[in-house]
UniProtKB/Swiss-Prot annotation:
Gene3D superfamilies: EF-hand. It comes from the Eukaryota. One of its GO terms (molecular function) is calcium ion binding. Keywords: Calcium, Coiled coil, Cytoplasm, Cytoskeleton, Metal-binding, Microtubule, Phosphoprotein, Repeat, Ubl conjugation. This is Ninein-like protein. A motif (KEN box) lies at residues 494-496. The lineage of its organism: Eukaryota, Metazoa, Chordata, Craniata, Vertebrata. It is found in: Cytoplasm, Cytoskeleton, Microtubule organizing center, Centrosome; Cytoplasm. A motif (D-box) lies at residues 632-640. Residues 382-423, 461-515, 544-584, 835-863, 1057-1229, 1269-1331 form a coiled coil. It comes from Mus musculus. GO terms for cellular component: centrosome; cytoplasm; microtubule. Residues 8-43, 42-77, 197-232, 234-269 form the EF-hand domain.
């Protein structure tokens, strides 16, 4: 072990030793030694160690060196076990002869030694050869009392010893033995002179740890053993290396023999025995064994120099030295044979020498051997003593130098303290002046700031009230608008429901009228068949009337058609003006026209189209109302919160003000009471003094005239007695005066001394207290100024950061909203452009289709005009053929009721022939409207039902007239003319193909054939033509562009029109015959009455038609009203949007105002910084303080903590004020005590004066008889002396009173300063509270802005969701409308064909 490690373990042992030294003297008694051994883990060695150190004297004390020697001796005796060899031979410990000690001191013996017996020389020689053999391989480990044992004992307390590599733990010099001593020594059950072998020790360890029962250890059990012996920090790799090193046979287990060989393979069994001397360890073992009987001795030099160790000059701290160093040390002293001396002392010249063992060996040699060795030992001791003497001298010099340095340092410190005191006093005076100046400046500025803040607060509240009134007006207006909109919506809903009911009723009336018309037609046909004769020529006279009626109806129809076209155009314009969500999703404007005649689901869909509009508007209005309600609630909550806060602040301010006023009033009242008491006491004392003065004057003046009179009266008679009494009285008076004077002087001196001491103590305490309070107030004020400046800087920085964050957040929100709005606008624009393009495309296609249809219709019209002109030319000729035709009873072609022609047959009579001829005529008349599709583009689907109602009564009239047999008809048929009625549908079908126009024409022809009623006049023809035109107009919007006639069909159309014109001519001829027949039948009144009735019914039906038209007009007007209401709702919506924009502008305005307020707050906060800069320019000392404040301002402290600190400081100042008040109360009490004492003194003085007065009076009475004038003069002199003493006492009393008044003035000044400081602190606290409230308000405003932004975002999301829902609904409605259009297009032909 090197020097550093040894010094380290010695220092650690000394630290443990010092920790047990409770007295601090450097000596330990028995209890402290027991505690030290417990800390070192030496419970088993404790009795032996106590016996070695203390002996029988349990009250003795030992120092560190003695403990170290005994400690090493105990450990070396515990480790001095001789292992046995293989043959079982062991060396026996020699017994020593007891030598009596040379000196005994108590329980300690000095000069004792042991002489062990010599062992077997052969055994010793063999043992020495073994040691030399093993020493050639490894250096031997010595069982000496070195500091290795200290290292082993401290290994459990220090973790560093466990961090060494494993090989060093087992191979380092001295390490294994000390480790084995520690482990095996502490685990033994008892401490006895006879020890076990290493095998038994290892087995004992395994048994205590509960491992190795099978005689082998695995890796985990080896780790447990290593931890138990102090190797706690072995890593896994090191443990594996140790296990592989111990496992020599490689079976994966460590046996007991392998473990023992690995642990003790490097340990020498023992050291060789010398023929002349025994090793020191054996000496110490014998000493351990013989310590109980007190028969052993030690060296006298060693005992005198306790803890002495030789060769300290060559000791590096480890307790070992090289033999060369020892030999050279001896050579320096003149001893040349040092190597032989070492060998003779059984020390090897090739290894390090244990200096302690060498010391003991030399000590033993000094006692036993004379000669050169003794000289060498003495030289060593002399060298050691000289070395230590040099060290002591060096230490003394260092101590003296340190003492001089300390004195110099103390002088410098005193000088520095004086300078610092002067500097501090100057600084205090300067800071007091500056603080007063600053207080005045701050008071003025604080008053100005307070007035400005009050004005700003009033302005803020005025603005808030105005804004609140404006917002309340806006809310009221919005509520009124909301109620009006809601009322309008309810009215619109009611109107829609009423219109739906009216339309349903009209549809029911139409169905009833249709049924009535059919019934009337059947009745009329029956009547005409039965009663109308062909000879009644009266009907022919009514031809002109019927033509006029037809013309009137045609004009009315045209007017209605024009009116319907105009209404249709207006409806189309309205649809274009409506938003896309309210428009019809169909591609053509005729989608809704096909819904009214259907009367079913289409009718309900058309009527309820305005319901989504009203619901959407109502939802929007509800949302607006909720938003305004929320805004109003938020505004009310804000106003209420601010009002409550202001009220609380006012109440707190009033409360604090009242408390302060009450406190000040109490203090003033207490001071006034004290002042009144002092004044009363002063008045009383003055009165007492005046009374005393008067008494003294009276006593001095009254006896003057008496002595003369008495002297003259009694001089002669009582001269002898007067002299004797005078002497006695004089003596007695002198004694009494002396006694009274002494007592009064003693009392006065005591009182005065006590009062002076008390006064001095009070003055000193007050001055100290005043100085402390002044220093504290100055420090608190400066600290407060620093804190306020730092707080202002922090608040300014935080406010700037907060404003930047808010502005950045607002910018981000604004950018997001702008992006969302731009996206929304772009999307709306795209959808609008797409919709516009679609509508333009559809309208373009419709216009193209209409143009093509108009061309076709123009061609048809041209052909129709030619046919009509030919018909007009043929009319006279046909009329001329009438008589001839009536006379020809030829066969006719029969027409079946289903429209098919049959073969000519013989008719049984003229009546039947005529009856069969009229259905054919009716069929030919019904087929006539086919060539008149010129007005298809003008018809609208809304007037279809009206035209049907108008058309069916006319058809009834037409069908009722030609049922009477007519001669003209028979004449026509008799000429062999065959009616080509069934040819028209067959011609129309190939010409038009699968178009809807062919289907309508065919359905009209079939309907005319099924009726089997002959047409009687031209009015029926016109009505039939109108019916077909209405059907064609109704079917025109459903015709797609692909169904327009192509060029091939255009070539077929002229041929078809020519044939149809021929048929029309034939029908006209037949109608003329019918008219003549009706004119001839005019003679029959019954038939006329029937015709009159039919005409009246026709008029009634016309009036019904007019009513229906009026109802339609009213419905159109109602629709117009609804459209206006919708426009009003639009305007309201725009107004609401404008209101939202106004609210947003108001919020922006509020934000601007808040930023202005923040700027104003920053400006107000910047003013103190400006003041600080001004103070920096004016005052140099305050500039240093401000720099410190700016440096301290970098620290971040919360405002609430600062306010709390200020409150705590205010409480502390209040406590100090209370303490001052208590001190003042104590002073007043002491003053009262002094006054009471003074009063008692005055009373005693008055008693003495009264007694003195009585004595004087007696003396005067006696002197009136005996005392002469000289005696009176002496008494007067005594009275003057007393008066001087009384005046002196009054002067002292006046001085005391003045001092008391000065103290009271000082107390009042201190209280005034404290009030000023409290006022300043309260103002600072109020300012900080206001600033905190402003910060909270700004935070609340920011939070409200965030909430408003969130609401706006939610509103935008809701509108987007609603728009998506509306688009989805529009898509669904478009699909439904397409499906309904398809369904109607399929159902319409079937319904018309029925």
């Amino acid at each position: 072990m090197d020097n550093e490690e040894e010094n380290h373990y010695v220092s650690r042992l000394r630290d443990v030793y010092s920790s047990c030294d409770t007295t601090g003297t450097g000596f330990l008694d028995q209890e402290e030694l027991t505690q030290l051994c417990t800390k070192l883990g030496l419970e088993e060695q404790l009795p032996a160690l106590l016996h070695i150190l203390l002996g029988d004297d349990r009250l003795a004390r030992v120092n560190f060196e003695e403990f170290k020697e005994g400690f090493v001796a105990v450990l070396s005796s515990g480790s001095g076990v001789e292992p046995s060899d293989e043959e079982g031979s062991s060396s026996e410990s020699a017994t020593s002869c007891a030598v009596p000690p040379k000196y005994m001191s108590g329980s300690k013996w000095y000069g004792r030694r042991s002489l062990p017996e010599l062992g077997d020389s052969a055994t010793a020689t063999k043992y020495g050869s073994e040691q030399q053999a093993k020493g050639s391989v490894k250096p031997p480990l010595r069982r000496s009392a070195s500091l290795e044992s200290v290292e082993s004992l401290k290994s459990d307390e220090d973790a560093e010893s466990a961090k060494e590599p494993q090989n060093e733990l087992f191979e380092a010099q001295g390490q294994l033995r000390s480790w084995g001593c520690e482990v095996f020594g502490t685990l033994r059950k008892s401490c006895s002179p006879s020890f076990s072998t290493p095998e038994n020790l290892v087995q004992g360890i395994w048994h205590e740890l509960g491992i190795g029962s099978s005689g082998h250890l695995n890796e985990q059990e080896l780790a447990v053993v290593c931890r138990s012996i102090g190797l706690h920090s072995l890593e896994k790799q090191e443990l594996e290396e140790l296990f592989s090193k111990l496992d020599q046979d490689g079976d994966g287990r460590v046996s007991l023999a392998e473990f023992q060989l690995g642990l003790f393979g490097h340990e020498p069994p023992s050291l060789p025995a010398s023929s002349s001397l025994i090793k020191p360890n054996r000496l110490w073992s014998h000493y351990q064994e013989e310590s109980g009987c007190h028969t052993t001795t030690t060296s006298s030099l060693v005992s005198v120099c306790s803890g002495l160790r030789l060769f300290s000059s060559v000791d590096d701290g480890s307790g070992f030295a090289f033999p060369e160093q020892v030999i050279s040390a001896w050579a320096q002293e003149g001893i040349q044979n040092g190597r032989e001396i070492l060998q003779s002392l059984d020390f090897s010249v090739d290894e390090k020498v244990n200096l302690l063992e060498l010391t003991w060996a030399l000590d033993n040699e000094l006692l036993t051997v004379d000669g050169v060795i003794q000289q060498a030992a003495l030289a060593c001791y002399r060298q050691e003593l000289s070395y230590h003497q040099g060290q002591v001298d060096q230490l003394v010099q260092e101590r003296d130098k340190a003492r001089q340095d300390l004195e110099k340092a103390e002088k410098r410190n005193l000088d520095f303290v004086r300078e610092m005191d002067d500097c501090h006093s100057a600084l205090e005076q300067l800071t007091e002046k500056k603080i007063k100046h600053l207080e005045q400046e701050y008071r003025g500025r604080l008053s100005l700031l307070r007035s400005e803040v009050e004005m700003e607060r009033e302005l803020f509240w005025e603005q808030a009230r105005r804004q609140r009134a404006v917002l309340e007006q806006d809310v009221g207006r919005l509520q009124a608008e909301e109620t009006s909109l809601r009322e309008k919506l309810t009215l619109a809903l009611k109107e829609n429901s009423r219109l739906q009911k009216e339309i349903i009723e009209v549809v029911e009336k139409l169905s009833d009228s249709e049924k009535l018309v059919l019934r009337l037609q059947s009745d009329l046909q029956f009547v005409l068949k039965d009663k109308l004769e062909p000879q009644s020529m009266e009907l022919l006279a009514q031809e002109e009337q019927f033509t006029a009626i037809l013309n009137d109806y045609e004009l009315k129809c045209r007017d209605l058609q024009d009116r319907n076209d105009e209404l249709q155009a207006e409806l189309e314009g309205l649809r274009l003006r409506l938003p896309r969500s309210r428009q019809s999703p169909a591609g053509t404007p005729g989608t809704h026209r096909r819904r009214i005649p259907g009367r079913g689901p289409a009718d309900n869909l058309f009527v309820g189209e305005s319901t989504p509009v009203s619901l959407e508007t109502e939802i929007m209005v509800e949302q607006m109302k909720e938003h305004y309600q929320e805004l109003r609630m938020q505004l009310e909550t804000k106003v209420n919160y601010y009002e409550k806060e202001i009220e609380v602040m006012k109440r707190n301010f009033e409360k604090d003000k009242k408390e302060m006023e009450q406190a000040f009033q109490l203090e003033v009242s207490v001071l006034e009471g004290q002042k009144a008491d002092l004044e009363a006491l002063y008045a009383k004392s003055q009165e007492v003094i005046l009374g005393l003065k008067e008494q003294l004057q009276d006593a001095a003046q009254s006896p003057e005239p008496a002595p003369a009179g008495l002297a003259h009266c009694c001089a002669q008679a009582l001269c002898t007695l007067a002299q004797r009494l005078e002497v006695e009285m004089h003596l007695r008076h002198q004694d009494q005066l002396l006694q009274i004077r002494q007592e009064a002087e003693e009392e006065l001196n005591q009182k005065l001394s006590w009062l002076e001491a008390q006064h001095a103590a009070c003055c000193e305490s007050l001055s100290l207290q005043h100085q402390c309070e002044k220093d504290q107030l100055l420090q608190t004020h400066l600290q407060r100024v620093k804190d306020l400046a730092a707080q202002l800087d922090l608040e300014k920085g935080r406010r700037e950061e907060r404003e930047q964050e808010v502005l950045a957040h607002c910018r981000r929100q604004q950018l997001k909203l702008q992006a969302v709005m731009s996206e929304e606008q772009a999307r709306i624009c795209r959808s609008f452009t797409l919709e516009k393009e679609k509508l333009e495309q559809t309208y373009r296609e419709q216009v193209e289709g209409l143009v093509q249809e108009a061309d076709v219709l123009r061609a048809l019209l041209k052909n129709g005009t030619t046919v009509v002109s030919d018909q007009q030319e043929r009319t006279p000729s046909s009329m001329s053929l009438g008589p001839d035709s009536r006379q020809q009873p030829t066969a006719r072609q029969a027409v079946s009721p289903d429209g098919r022609t049959g073969a000519p047959a013989e008719w049984p009579g003229p009546e039947k022939a005529e009856g069969r001829d009229f259905p054919g005529q009716l069929c030919s008349i019904d087929a006539m409207p086919s060539p008149t599709p010129t007005l298809l583009s003008r018809r609208s689907s809304e007037n279809l039902g009206v035209r049907d109602n108008h058309q069916r009564p006319l058809n009834a009239e037409e069908g009722a007239i030609p049922k009477e047999p007519e001669p003209s008809a028979r004449t026509l048929t008799g000429q062999g003319q065959k009616l080509p009625l069934p040819v028209h549908p067959q011609m129309l079908e190939p010409s038009l193909g699968t178009t809807a126009l062919d289907r309508k024409a065919a359905s009209v022809g079939v309907q005319g054939q099924a009726s089997e009623g002959p047409v009687g006049d031209g009015e029926g023809v016109q009505e039939a033509w109108l019916q077909f035109r209405g059907e064609a107009t109704r079917m025109r919007p459903s015709l797609p562009c692909s169904e327009l006639p192509n060029p091939q069909e255009a070539t077929v159309m002229p041929a078809m029109s020519e044939s149809e014109m021929k048929d029309v001519k034939i029908k006209l001829l037949q109608l003329e015959d019918v008219v003549r027949a009706l004119e001839k039948a005019d003679s029959r009144e019954s038939y006329r009455a029937e015709l009159q009735r039919l005409s009246e019914e026709n008029l009634v039906l016309k009036s019904d038609l007019g009513k229906i038209q009026l109802e339609l007009e009213t419905s159109e007007s109602k629709n117009e009203v609804q459209r206006q209401e919708i426009e009003v709702l639009k305007r309201d919506k725009e107004q609401a949007c404008c209101d939202l924009e106004e609210l947003s502008t108001q919020t922006q305005k509020y934000k601007d105002e808040m930023s202005q307020l923040n700027c104003r707050v920053l400006q107000l906060e910047g003013e103190p910084s400006g003041l600080h800069t001004q103070k920096e320019e004016n005052h140099g000392a305050i500039q240093v303080l401000m720099k410190k404040l700016e440096e301290a301002g970098c620290r971040e402290e919360q405002q609430g903590d600062q306010i709390q600190n200020l409150k705590i400081e205010l409480e502390r100042v209040n406590e100090e004020c209370q303490y001052l008040r208590l001190s003042q109360a104590e002073l007043t009490e002491s003053l009262e005590e002094s006054r009471s004492q003074l009063y008692s003194v005055q009373l005693r003085l008055e008693a003495a004066q009264s007694q003195h007065g009585r004595i004087v009076q007696r003396l005067q009475e006696q002197m009136s008889q005996l005392v002469p004038g000289a005696r009176v003069a002496e008494l007067q002199h005594l009275l003057n002396v007393k008066e001087e003493e009384a005046r002196r006492l009054s002067a002292q009393q006046e001085e005391y009173r003045q001092q008391l008044k000065a103290r009271e003035d000082q107390v009042e000044d201190a209280e005034a300063r404290l009030r000023n400081v409290e006022w300043l602190l309260q103002e600072k606290v109020e300012e900080l509270r206001k600033q905190f409230e402003k910060n909270t308000r700004s935070d609340l405003l920011l939070k409200e802005l965030y909430v408003e932004n969130a609401h706006l975002m939610k509103a935008v999301q809701l509108t987007e969701e609603k728009q998506r829902g509306a688009e989805k609904k529009n898509c669904v409605l478009e699909e439904k409308v397409r499906a309904l259009n398809k369904l109607i297009s399929k159902m319409a032909p079937a319904s018309l064909s029925v």
